[in-house]
């Protein structure tokens, strides 16, 4: 099969990369009604599979789970989760033929096998759903022409999808219809109903394309979301310990520092994160971030180029065929790093201490977020998509590190994200070592002393931070979420 994106001409590629429209709340006035009375069969009962299914059932839809015969016979975790939550469970042969919508929520590397197994069983005119378009765009899976192919992609882990729904809200979501598979013109109606059933319409929905979702998702997770956090954790820990910091304290400062720093990012973007610093520290963080952007720009661009060309996907799929040899080797090596094996610190670190002693970490976050955003936009991806795949998801990934360090992050993210993370971090760590050697006292592990600052310089830095395109679009999108949450809670 050919990479679908590479079969398109340049005009088609640009059109699909640039497809992004923030949908109005009024477009979801019918809620999930288009799918009510129809049979929805979910394949896979992992975090997305289970939690989307719970939300959809609570929204009045008929949900069941199709699992492989072995999973049922051996009562594996997927079978236990589905049955313990009161769902009907059956084999592909038992459930797929009656399904109006089959939702494939298995891991990326299983998609081809799953789709080839379920396609012959699907009735004429049924629909096939994804929450990530890798199988369609990168693998180039060919779907029967009578089948409608749609995507609903929540921009959060599955657990968050459920928790926000239970709070009466939802998570921002991308929806799309595959242009090669919409024979009855009902793809958008199906996608909107599915998104509404998960609660996504309450937080904001972007009408996108399979291509834009895949290319931006891969770029975000490889660079700022996972790769930068992993590289930053390893570099910062080693630097602190080399300069005499207690390894346990250094580990805690980094493990929980990312989460604390990005919580400010979540509430008010890069502007608020930088405002948590003293004026001298803000000026230093800004200067460090500009240096980092200059050093790392070629690496970010290489990752984007390899994603656009399909080079990344072909390399990863070759590793799939080789029993994940590279992935498993990198995973094992990460588990043996000094950061992962450091002792736990029993003392308390105050919230402001993470900011005051983490100026370099803040600079890394700023540089990584802006670079990922800029590189995506320069490649034809619309700003709203680039925002969701960079700044918006970063606090969620930082939270996984706060739970069990890099191990937890790499367990929670997909194998696709994990593979890309290692590619980036293995290149980024040696790239930044000369930069790390030139750091000054106060950049990491100790606070920058208060002192006089140049008013004009501070004014210009504040203007530069606030005027960046990601701050402009971020303020708009966070405003939409706040407004929609207010409406949802009131209604």
Swiss-Prot record:
Name used for this protein in its record: Ketol-acid reductoisomerase (NADP(+))
Active site: 132
Stated pH dependence: Optimum pH is 7.5.
Catalytic reactions on record: (2R)-2,3-dihydroxy-3-methylbutanoate + NADP(+) = (2S)-2-acetolactate + NADPH + H(+); (2R,3R)-2,3-dihydroxy-3-methylpentanoate + NADP(+) = (S)-2-ethyl-2-hydroxy-3-oxobutanoate + NADPH + H(+)
Swiss-Prot/TrEMBL keywords: Amino-acid biosynthesis, Branched-chain amino acid biosynthesis, Magnesium, Metal-binding, NADP, Oxidoreductase, Repeat
Listed Gene3D superfamilies: N-(1-d-carboxylethyl)-l-norvaline Dehydrogenase, domain 2, NAD(P)-binding Rossmann-like Domain
MF terms (GO), sorted A to Z: ketol-acid reductoisomerase activity; magnesium ion binding
GO biological process: isoleucine biosynthetic process; L-valine biosynthetic process
Binding site for Mg(2+) 2: 217, 389, 393
Disulfide bonds: none
GO terms for cellular component: cytosol
Binding site for NADP(+): 45-48, 68, 76, 78, 108-110, 158
Residues given in the record as Mg(2+) 1 binding sites: 217, 221
Pathway assigned in UniProt: Amino-acid biosynthesis; L-isoleucine biosynthesis; L-isoleucine from 2-oxobutanoate: step 2/4; Amino-acid biosynthesis; L-valine biosynthesis; L-valine from pyruvate: step 2/4
Gene giving rise to this polypeptide: ilvC
Cofactors: Mg(2+)
Its biological purpose: Involved in the biosynthesis of branched-chain amino acids (BCAA). Catalyzes an alkyl-migration followed by a ketol-acid reduction of (S)-2-acetolactate (S2AL) to yield (R)-2,3-dihydroxy-isovalerate. In the isomerase reaction, S2AL is rearranged via a Mg-dependent methyl migration to produce 3-hydroxy-3-methyl-2-ketobutyrate (HMKB). In the reductase reaction, this 2-ketoacid undergoes a metal-dependent reduction by NADPH to yield (R)-2,3-dihydroxy-isovalerate.
Catalytic activity, EC: 1.1.1.86
Enzyme class: oxidoreductase
Protein family per UniProt: Belongs to the ketol-acid reductoisomerase family.
KARI C-terminal knotted domain location: 209-344, 345-484
Residues where substrate binds: 414
Organism: Salmonella typhimurium (strain LT2 / SGSC1412 / ATCC 700720)
Domain of life, source organism: Bacteria
Domain KARI N-terminal Rossmann positions: 15-208
Cofactor binding note of this UniProt entry: Binds 2 magnesium ions per subunit.
Protein induction: In the presence of acetohydroxybutyrate and acetolactate.
